[in-house]
Amino acid sequence: MNYKGFNFGASFLVLLISGSAAFASDNEDLGWQFNANKPSQMVRGGVGLIQTPTARMSSAGTMTANYTDNEEYRFWSVSIQLFDWLETTARYTDVRTVNYSEFPGFSGDQTLKDKGIDVKFRLLQESRYLPQLAVGFNDFGGTGLFESEFIALSKAWGNIDFHLGMGWGYLGAAGNTLNPLCEIRESFCTRPGETLGQGGKISYTKFFKGPASLFAGVEYQTPWHPLRLKLEYEGNDYSRDRAGELTQDSRWNIGAVYQWRDVTFDLNYQRGNTLGFGVHYQLDLNSNDQPKIKPAMRPVASPRAQRDDFANLNLILNQLLSNAGFYLKTSKMTDDEFILYGHQLFYRDDEEATERLARVVLTQLPSHIKRIRVIEFSGNLPLVEKVIDVEAFAKAAAYDELQPDIRSTYIRQTPDKSIMALADVPYDTGFYTGAEIFWIQSFGNPESFYMYQGGLFLGAGYRFTENFSFNGAAKLTLLENFDQFNFKVDALDTPLPRVRTFAREYVTRSKLTMENAYGHWQKQLGDNWFAQAYGGYLETMFGGVGTEVLYRPVDSNFAVGFDLNYVRQRSFENDLDFFDYNTFTGHINLYWQPEFLPDTRLTFNIGQFLAQDKGVNVDFAKRFDSGIVIGAYAAITNVSSDEYGEGSFTKGFYLSLPFDLFAVKPAKGRGRLPWVPIARDGGQPLNRPVKLIDMTEARSDFYN
């Protein structure tokens, strides 16, 4: 141990405690609670001190983007608090002392980039007498540069937060204590050193094995609210770092954190010889929203005005679109009901859309109408019927009740066949066009760390009948650096058909390409059953024919369906030709929103993938109050990690963003930002141009 460093650290700790006592004497209301700003991030991302993690968690829905720099390493990371008990971190590391490869013609002078994923679970929440307890796994699914496991305790007293932990792997490299698990079982005494497979595979055989180290620290909230100070004692000796053996003059690290609104800046001194700094931006995924310019809701009087007929039916029809975003196909009035058939075009929030529509109608509604029925369509499919109790809604909308609840004044159900038969609903036919922005991105490439391609998808189609249409889309590239590619196809000898690893050939063939062109048939088979069939050029790399059936009740947390497709690989030499490779692909698709994981959807696709491998793709999606959805997926098939190649199995992450977060007026629709660490040929599904689960989203809103 470096005693000079130890004495300095101990002196610093005494100063912190004495300062805390003086400050706390004037702030007795602090009690045992830690009076702090938002939890701060450690160097590699995730809530912690400097090099060591703690048991602390951010509030649920917090996303933090981090950049840190400490001489040999640079880190870019994103930490997301999915639940109050689960923290996840994805990270890229720049190892400045090592080249990306030994071949300048392949990667130039670029330095080594490595990716990693961390998770931390809270096992026990802090109470007055008990500390907070957490367990974590760092870099557990990558190449293992910082692979480690830890158990951490955190306990606050006044304006000081105390932390103690034990680490294995990278965090325990110094071996300053005995591994307690070694006393239980001999296999825990030695940590396996081999790299499993092709990387990307969870090294569970290493968990909590080998040398262990204790680490500890304190975080002090100064009387000046934006400033916090940190002191830690770490358990790593940096003897086996990827950047080379690093000199460590002290195991004490000190740092300061300054918070300005949602941005924090930190400065630290590590290993007794290295200065580091970082910048961090926090975003609340629950409350993030864009102020909107939208018309005021129509006032509702209670009791209702007495009238025998509509005061001004034309006014209703005009205001349904301008005030409520509802495009009316047709309407029908019976003895005690007013029925509207149409599309919701602008309002993503179903409750707001329903309230606006009902308010518009009630301003002119005859007194004898007891219920308003709204049949909402997607294309030509009637998906959901809302039955609004007029009297109950009028009281809630006029705030006649102490705690008005608009949602309790209407029900959602499958459209009633007798109600559908009352009106001759005009179906959408004819030409239609559209355009949307696309952005393709890739991280960690040998040519450049960040590579991108952006432009427009230009779509058009013709609806021939209620059920059949022909659709097409062209891809126009406007901005890219894919012209820096120094190879189109890797030289690996893969036993799998190259169903996706020709990707560079496809995306660089031309600035203007045909993305898809296909015929599409859809129909509602029963109250909760939907079907579709399609054929043509289905996606960038494949064409063929397919069909899908889906069972999805209204507002159910469960849906099930299947799809079956026969496809052939498209040529990357032109838009129209095909290669010889063909196959069947299809899946049983299960969609489940478990009650024990609020605002979460699990999707299981079980079947055969494009490379004729068989298995399951599991997709986890978490929605936040703002409408932002964060998801992750992994495909496990009968292809071994050696056959698959680098990455061991298909996995990826995505961020789904509602358009109206960036718009000043209400808008529907979404954009998706994917991150795929490694894309190989195993576990790859067909990118079908239309999916029934998306087409029927209004029946059980998850993304809206």
Role assignments for model-derived ranges:
Residues 24-64, 211-213, 290-300, 398-431, ...:
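Outer-membrane beta-barrel biogenesis signature
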Residues 65, 76-80, 117-121, 151-155, ...:
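Residues on the lipid-exposed face of transmembrane beta-strands in outer-membrane beta-barrel proteins
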Residues 82-84, 120-127, 157-159, 220-224, ...:
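Outer-membrane beta-barrel proteins
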Residues 26-30, 90-118, 122, 136-140, ...:
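Outer-membrane beta-barrel translocator/channel fold
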Residues 24-145, 157-158, 170, 202, ...:
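Transmembrane beta-barrel domains of Gram-negative outer membranes and organellar outer membranes
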Residues 287-335:
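N-proximal, solvent-exposed amphipathic alpha-helical segments enriched in charged/polar residues
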Residues 63-67, 78, 88-90, 119, ...:
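Membrane-embedded beta-strand positions of outer-membrane beta-barrel proteins
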Residues 59-63, 74, 84-86, 129-133, ...:
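Outer-envelope beta-barrel architecture signal
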